[in-house]
Amino acid sequence: MLSSLQNPRQAAAQLMNFGLILSTAFMMWKGLSVITDSPSPIVVVLSGSMEPAFQRGDLLLLWNRNLISETNVGEIVVYNVKGKDIPIVHRIVRKFGVGPDAKLLTKGDNNAADDTELYARGQDYLNRKDIVGSVVGYMPFVGYVTIMLSEHPWLKTVMLGIMGLVVVLQRE
């Protein structure tokens, strides 16, 4: 089992194999970002603000290539707020104006009030450039792994350790 560590070539090959897996995952993520024109083409719902449409832990697929159509009222979008690094998933409830200069107001389906309190200080509406993408699909509860890893940091260490052991103990 540990004899494979004694051969430096085999250990280097296993290390390169692990690097190949990581770089392939990174390239797939970046490719998906280019195709969808979204810096974050896949996001996880972190709260219950969009219930019953989406549950906590749902994995959302985003699309940001609205070349012909505009962002419309009723559309579920993911947006970033200046100064905060967690994207928010909510529905557009009002739209003022047309084209790239339109102002958008959002609200969670399960929230009592609109999102003006969530926006950056001095910001009353979202601009089109604040939108990360529109939701085009979802996979229920698949994102719960991400939530578990962020809520239990020790779980990251355990998973990385298991992945490392699999790579080291892998037989060819």
UniProtKB/Swiss-Prot annotation:
- Which residue stretches are annotated as topological domain Cytoplasmic? 1-14
Q: What is this protein called?
A: Signal peptidase complex catalytic subunit SEC11
Q: What is known of its domains?
A: The C-terminal short (CTS) helix is essential for catalytic activity. It may be accommodated as a transmembrane helix in the thinned membrane environment of the complex, similarly to the signal peptide in the complex substrates.
Q: Tell me the membrane topology, using the record's own terms.
A: Single-pass type II membrane protein
Picking any one GO biological process from the record gives: protein targeting to ER
UniProt key word Transmembrane = yes
Q: Which GO terms describe its molecular function?
A: serine-type endopeptidase activity
For this protein, the Enzyme Commission number is 3.4.21.89
Residues spanning the membrane: 15-35
Reactions this protein catalyses? Cleavage of hydrophobic, N-terminal signal or leader sequences from secreted and periplasmic proteins
Q: Which family does it belong to?
A: Belongs to the peptidase S26B family.
Q: Which PANTHER family match?
A: SIGNAL PEPTIDASE COMPLEX CATALYTIC SUBUNIT SEC11 (PTHR10806:SF6)
Show the segment(s) annotated as C-terminal short (CTS) helix: 158-169
Catalytic machinery residues = 49 (charge relay system), 90 (charge relay system), 115 (charge relay system)
The protein's gene is named SEC11
